[in-house]
Each structure stands twice: as structure tokens, then as C-alpha cells.
């Protein structure tokens, strides 16, 4: 049996990346919340 997590940079960025967050209103809310919390890293 293989491990379930097979990391790929492209697919991760497509779902969790900065540009994908900016492309939707809810994604922008996520970024705003992370800025308000003071996260050093906003997105993947």
C-alpha cells in the first residue's frame, strides 16, 4: 500500500495558492483573516 499523500507543487498551488485565493471573494476573505491574525505565510 502506498502513502495517500503524493505531493505535487502544481496541484497544491492550484487549490491553495495565492492567485487561486484572490480569484474568489471567499478566498479573499481567507487572506484577510490570515492577515488579521498576523500569519507570516498567507498561502501555499
Swiss-Prot record:
Region (Disordered), start-end ranges: 1-44
Pfam families, alphabetized: Ribosomal_L34 (PF00468)
Gene3D superfamilies registered for this protein in UniProt: 1.10.287.3980
Family annotation (InterPro entries): Ribosomal_bL34 (IPR000271), Ribosomal_bL34_CS (IPR020939)
Gene Ontology process terms (BP): translation
Superkingdom of source: Bacteria
GO molecular function: structural constituent of ribosome
Cellular component GO terms, alphabetical: ribonucleoprotein complex; ribosome
Alphabetical list of PROSITE patterns matching this protein: RIBOSOMAL_L34 (PS00784)
Keywords: Ribonucleoprotein, Ribosomal protein
Disulfide links within the chain: none
Compositional bias per record (Basic residues), positions renumbered to this chain: 7-19, 31-44
Recorded family membership: Belongs to the bacterial ribosomal protein bL34 family.
Name under which the protein is recorded: Large ribosomal subunit protein bL34
Organism annotation: Lachnoclostridium phytofermentans (strain ATCC 700394 / DSM 18823 / ISDg)
Amino acid at each position: 500500500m502506498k502513502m495517500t499523500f503524493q505531493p505535487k507543487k502544481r496541484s497544491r498551488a492550484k487549490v491553495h495558492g495565492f492567485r487561486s485565493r484572490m480569484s474568489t471573494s471567499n478566498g479573499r476573505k481567507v487572506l484577510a483573516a490570515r492577515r488579521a491574525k498576523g500569519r507570516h505565510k498567507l498561502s501555499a
